[in-house]
Design a protein with these regions (language model features):
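Divalent-metal coordination cores built from histidine and acidic residues
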Residues: 1-110
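Divalent metal-binding pocket/active-site signature
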Residues: 102-126
Length: 126
């Protein structure tokens, strides 16, 4: 039975540090989708978004539930320092904060973290 028939009206997406926006380089987006394909599948869609606004527009009037999107630490990290396994320096952390601020202004509900999947597993816990 679909969740909506059970009264579920909102889905939280972007959990565990994995999310699909913002990605300003389409190759990085495709790489993230490929890494997560074992968890999320690999749907046959055009991966042509970059911002949170663009991503949320994919769901607008196309799904039966409300979407609450949280930005994962992984796209923030990739946006600031690529796929590097190094510890983020202060400039890279500031860039990540700026990307998160922008994402929330575009409609993200919050941020999620996860240290089990790349590139989030490269992050330092400090």
């Amino acid at each position: 039975m679909p969740k909506v028939h059970k009264g579920v009206t909102t889905e939280l997406i972007g959990i565990d540090g994995n999310s699909y926006a913002p990605f300003y380089n389409n190759l990085d987006l495709k790489r993230m989708i490929q890494i997560n394909s074992g968890l999320d599948g690999d749907p046959d869609i055009d991966y042509n978004w970059s911002t949170v606004t663009d991503y949320l527009d994919l769901f607008d009037k196309k799904v039966a539930v409300n979407i609450a999107y949280v930005v994962g630490n992984s796209p923030l990290r990739v946006g600031a320092m690529g796929w590097s396994a190094n510890k983020a320096n202060s400039k890279e952390l500031d860039t990540q904060k700026g990307l998160l601020r922008e994402a929330m202004q575009e409609g993200a509900f919050g941020m999620s973290t996860g240290l089990d999947y790349p590139p989030g597993n490269y992050a330092d816990t400090d």
